[in-house]
Amino acid sequence: MQLINVIKSSGVSQSFDPQKIIKVLSWAAEGTSVDPYELYENIKSYLRDGMTTDDIQTIVIKAAANSISVEEPDYQYVAARCLMFALRKHVYGQYEPRSFIDHISYCVNAGKYDPELLSKYSAEEITFLESKIKHERDMEFTYSGAMQLKEKYLVKDKTTGQIYETPQFAFMTIGMALHQDEPVDRLKHVIRFYEAVSTRQISLPTPIMAGCRTPTRQFSSCVVIEAGDSLKSINKASASIVEYISKRAGIGINVGMIRAEGSKIGMGEVRHTGVIPFWKHFQTAVKSCSQGGIRGGAATAYYPIWHLEVENLLVLKNNKGVEENRIRHMDYGVQLNDLMMERFGKNDYITLFSPHEMGGELYYSYFKDQDRFRELYEAAEKDPNIRKKRIKARELFELLMTERSGTARIYVQFIDNTNNYTPFIREKAPIRQSNLCCEIAIPTNDVNSPDAEIGLCTLSAFVLDNFDWQDQDKINELAEVQVRALDNLLDYQGYPVPEAEKAKKRRNLGVGVTNYAAWLASNFASYEDANDLTHELFERLQYGLIKASIKLAKEKGPSEYYSDTRWSRGELPIDWYNKKIDQIAAPKYVCDWSALREDLKLFGIRNSTLSALMPCESSSQVSNSTNGYEPPRGPVSVKESKEGSFNQVVPNIEHNIDLYDYTWKLAKKGNKPYLTQVAIMLKWVCQSASANTYYDPQIFPKGKVPMSIMIDDMLYGWYYGIKNFYYHNTRDGSGTDDYEIETPKADDCAACKL
């Protein structure tokens, strides 16, 4: 190799010394199977005279990242260490971080950190916390995790791209912000939080990871807003959407109350224009702001299947029609109940009505009281004075499934499952919608009513396989960390609209899981045979969460709306779950529910809800985990970043590659193994799950998924208590389906996912 000169960051030119780069590569490859000399040989040909040291670092990182494969998975650690090495140099001008107090002061003065980090904590406390920071954990990320942190989570100037922190400082300052007002054992709580996050035993959502410690104070992952049937309500809902979209939130909108086209307004002097113009208004609100400077917002709109305009509403997202009769930039949730399922089963008719009929009582009883709804619905069918349309249930269900399969993003919500298998008392706090990603099930109320309520939920997740799942003390500890931190967040954050402040009275949390597929593989189990294993795991997790919330209630008091919940009656998930689950997982318990019930009766509970099963697409990269409870597409997923694409391999690939259930192999066995596990999880989970379906047309005659198969899956999920169906995934046969190619989707949002 000819002699070349390199330019240092100081601007000084000096002769290139191969030993310096080999020394860094040897350090980065330590403890891995990667040969640093072999990596250097791959890099050599890219070196040019006059290159900067930054250019060389970029070449090293890219060469290592491009080498990540099933055969050479350790390159993901080498690439990550090289990236972190470069990041340290950029942030601090040297490899060693500056002192913690200097770091916080610098970021506060730059307007990047919340000044309360300095006013609420003394210099002595900050120095003590610094002694607990383990910067070497920056070198334990995979390349995918390191890139996710660098591009998405670490505090930066979005104009210049300057990054202000490294991961361990970020994790500790998030903990400091969340626990700053703890009156007792504050530092202990901060350190426990830091340990759980930095060892990747728990995972945090994008709003907390990117925003908590900064002057921004809106971290609720999921926002659910209910629009009524008046212009004032519609406009107020739209204004609320704009406020929350601008704060990075994903939106669920209940639009089902808006009356149908041609309905009377007032004394009949005006005929209603129908829902489509108003839904377009909501779409404009959703797309009006970028999410914290990232991209346009995202929303899912919910409505009942018996809405008089349903035939026009089901097709809103497809590529047929014209702009005037399509609203393609929102997703839709179609709400079914047991009566609708019964009509389908009997090959009967469904009668469509405008939801304002019967003074709105028909609509509200749909969620509040299923017996009353049946009574009113059947009376309305017989009433000649009420406008209606009859349609064969099978015809309507087939239209629903056709649009769901064609767009992938027409979701289904089973309203009776949602309201019957929940901590909320149905007649007191009915649930009338879900959120953007279908995992949230909490009460809302018309934003223009006297009892207006915007529902908020904050998320986190247990990272399965990163702790001993049968060590109940460990689970209890991780549950305590998450419940306390998320509960504190409710008081720490701001509320852009007053209707959302009831979040502090309900105190809804949604703790989920990620890395379930890797956990199955490590336990030599599959989606087909893990019923009892999943039952025990989720019993343990939910027990830990309930125990943590009771402990917090003893310390700080129960939620103000405690009386709206079954907890207030001394009930537990073992009391209110769908008993059909006993057919697939025997009700055998490993935790002491009797003792927990006594504590519940004695102290109450701090949080109305504690758990939800969300997608974990973003944070799964940081924690090096499989996405939520989904099967991975294949051993390798292809991630896209600003610096190009790169591979991520499944956890423990060197040992477990053949033990995983991969998506399309599992799909050949149908959706029931996957749906069975989700149903068992939901026996325990307070809220809902973003349950997906997967279809490979190649395995069916003529390469087309039969309608009967799709409807059978829906019936199976409903029967066993599943509350929502999320994405409808179809294998396209391109050959890339065995790889998870992840690019940002249009009309998507990271906020209500992890």
Curated annotation (Swiss-Prot):
Sorted alphabetically, the Gene Ontology BP terms of this entry are: deoxyribonucleotide biosynthetic process
Q: Where are the transmembrane segments?
A: none
In this chain, the site described as Important for electron transfer is at Y726, Y727
Ranges for region Disordered: 621-641
Report the EC number(s), separated by commas if there are several. Answer: 1.17.4.1
In this chain, the site described as Interacts with thioredoxin/glutaredoxin is at C749, C752
Keywords of this protein's UniProt record, alphabetized?
Answer: Allosteric enzyme, ATP-binding, Deoxyribonucleotide synthesis, Disulfide bond, Nucleotide-binding, Oxidoreductase
UniProt site positions, description: Allosteric effector binding:
D229, R259
The UniProt GO MF terms for this protein read: ATP binding; ribonucleoside-diphosphate reductase activity, thioredoxin disulfide as acceptor
Binding of substrate, residues: T206, S221, C222, G250, N435, L436, C437, C438, E439, P615, C616, E617, S618, S619
Q: How is its activity regulated?
A: Under complex allosteric control mediated by deoxynucleoside triphosphates and ATP binding. The type of nucleotide bound at the specificity site determines substrate preference. It seems probable that ATP makes the enzyme reduce CDP and UDP, dGTP favors ADP reduction and dTTP favors GDP reduction.
Q: Which cysteines are joined by disulfide bonds?
A: C222-C457
Q: Per the record's keyword annotation, is Nucleotide-binding included, yes or no?
A: yes
Q: Which Gene3D superfamilies match?
A: 1.10.1650.20, 3.20.70.20
Name the PANTHER family for this protein.
RIBONUCLEOSIDE-DIPHOSPHATE REDUCTASE LARGE CHAIN, RIBONUCLEOSIDE-DIPHOSPHATE REDUCTASE LARGE SUBUNIT
The subunit field of the Swiss-Prot or TrEMBL record says: Heterodimer of a large and a small subunit.
Concerning its family, UniProt says: Belongs to the ribonucleoside diphosphate reductase large chain family.
Q: What is this protein called?
A: Ribonucleoside-diphosphate reductase subunit alpha
Q: Which gene encodes it?
A: NRDA
